[in-house]
């Protein structure tokens, strides 16, 4: 009897796991989301922590400050992803060529559309056009664009610098992500019509950066 119970329990667990997987896929319906998060990645941190040898195109050649990591459809809590079935969506080469100036590589562009862009309900052309418009609407504080030495700052100080440079933003529209004790990203939230909007729980500041002070590596040593 105990063996039958054990087998039955395993079957129920397997069925539950399948149900969760299906639910997650169904939750990822294209076009079903509340707002976008524009993720601006601080390239010097990525290169210092993930690619110190300069193997990727992002970390060799001309130094970069903020690059576009992604433009993510979000729910107020949680997010959809990979809203397609079958083969990975095809991105036209002209779209890739247009985005390569603000995103650090072809692989990232393809990955971001497959994982996040498909959930926008937009074609690659329309999705990346929206991402570029959001990206270009944000002014990077002058000090960060030309940072020549490591800066020590609190997340709140970095946020205030962005608010000062972008009067259209409010405090609840911007979050700072860090780790380990370095600036990783600045995230700005946009409505579906590409207007700045309040962020949901996904951009909870206390969760994204627990450090009281963080280092901002320089663009140029």
Regions found by a protein language model. Give the residues of each.
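Positively charged n-region of N-terminal signal peptides that target proteins for export
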Residues: 1-5
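Short beta-strand-initiation
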Residues: 6-7, 183
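Hydrophobic membrane-insertion alpha-helices, especially the h-region
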Residues: 8-21
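Domain-level detector of nuclease and nuclease-like folds
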Residues: 37-39, 50-221
